[in-house]
Amino acid sequence: VGDLHLGGGGLGGVLLTALSPRVTLLVGAGLYLTAAVGARFGLSARPQRASGRPSVAQTWRNNAVLWSSVPRRYVFLALWVPNGLIVGCESLFVSLSPRHAGTLFACAAFGMLLGDIATGRFMPASWRRVLGAPLRLLLAVPYLVFAFHPALPVAALAVMLASIGYAASLLLQERLMALTPNELSGQALGLQSSGTLTMQGVGAVVAGVLAQCFSPSAAMTVMAVASVLVTVSLARGLRPERVESPIETVPVLAPAS
């Protein structure tokens, strides 16, 4: 999903070089509508696993249970905040370099693809236990180079290297599942996804405000520093010894859709 997000961003950057922003937005809206129609008529109905009637109140109760565990809380924050801050950096590619934004988005997508393949397919379990923190730092540290207004090759390399760090999310999701009872695993992933998308939006807004006040390169540097600080502050709670057994819960009713 992340690869497609960034790939779409790269395509948008390419379209901006050939079309007006208005036409590019219309093309994006048309593709979104096509995807919605495909999902509506192309996906088959599946029975829900949870019992009971969907309820917003039950959704919030389940979320409260998920949030009540301190180790799980650290994992959620590590999945949401550093990622969202770096997406704020990516949201400034067009304003940073309208001519080369497509290249930067493409490099970001390529880096994410490399990281996901290497981590998901080839990384042994022993490495997964020790490379989580370095990957989380890799997500942000390369963006510090934008403080020096790098040339395009250096900027593209920095973006590609940083995007490899998105693979840390795979390791954090494994950690989340190890800390979550089976009956809440689906809602845990849903909460993780919702929080991630929310923080990505927040990161883009904050980065945009900073870019308006200063410059895109300065805003990207600030967002990268903030991501590093958040990652370092969460490191203690993400140590392997903090893993605990999933809590016991009462039978879970279906969350609201």
Language-model regions: role of each:
Residues 2-14, 91, 197-208:
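Glycine/proline-centered helix-kink
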Residues 7, 19-26, 64-118, 216-217:
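A single, central transmembrane helix in multi-pass transporters
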Residues 25, 29-32, 96-257:
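C-terminal transmembrane bundle of multi-pass solute transporters/carriers
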Residues 45-77, 252-255:
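Juxtamembrane intracellular "pre-TM" segments in multi-pass secondary transporters
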Residues 59-60, 77, 93-94, 141, ...:
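A general structural signal for well-ordered alpha-helical segments in protein cores
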